[in-house]
Amino acid sequence: MIKDKPNRLMKLFLNVALEPWILRHYSSIKFMNEIAVKPDQSCLMLMNHYSFNDGFLLNRICRLLLKKQLKAMVIESQMKAFPILKYFGCFSVSKKSRSMIDSLNYAAESLKDPTVMLGIYPQGGLYSMHLNKIHFVPGLAYIFKHAKNVPFQVFFGVTLLDYLENYKPVARVYFTSYEGERDSNKMEEAYNLFYQSCKQQNQRLYRPPESVVDAV
């Protein structure tokens, strides 16, 4: 497991230079919902994972919307390819290693800090944003079990892109708060209901015939 090593100067570099430079590839980034964030509780943010840019988008969400300190679980191969990520709050997980338990324990432990937002991509890898469903790989249940006495909020995030009249894509990020049972199967079901709702909202942006909009 590669642990994060937050560095104030590197974090400043991320916020003022690297994040804007990476996210310049979007025409705009729009947060489509407001969420009520409790300052005395940590946050778990679950999002779909479709590109390398997701991490920088997650940092912006954490910084501007949640106003928390970022911790993000990242596939170990990506951490090795981009070792600078550890200075921004990222730590590794390897699905084919015994160190996976160390990563899950570290994630559960981080939720004890109310200043933290823990970002997890439940798909466990990069997948097309055009999938009809988001699958959850094992691991969340372990985190919930080892953080069962810790008060923390759970948020769902869905990022969808459209070009429409723009030269570069517009990223629309939809959010909702999850108040249900801390059960990974029920959470996966709830996430997919929200995911379908977000896709439906995105499809209706330019008022197409209702017959071509996906049914939820």
Task: Indicate residue ranges for each PLM-predicted region.
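Non-catalytic C-terminal accessory region of glycerolipid acyltransferases
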Residues: 2-3, 104-216
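Short, flexible loop segments at the rims of nucleotide/cofactor-binding pockets, characterized by
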Residues: 19-26, 94-99, 131-132
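Catalytic core of membrane glycerolipid acyltransferases/transacylases, capturing the structured
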Residues: 39-97
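Soluble or luminal CAZymes and related metallo-dependent hydrolases
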Residues: 10-14, 98-103, 136
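Alpha-helical membrane-targeting segments
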Residues: 1-26, 80-89
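Helix-to-loop junction immediately C-terminal to a conserved catalytic motif
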Residues: 12, 17-49
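Short amphipathic alpha-helical face segments that pack within enzyme cores
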Residues: 23, 54-57, 139-143
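Glycine-rich, highly charged phosphate/nucleotide-binding loops
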Residues: 25-31, 99-106
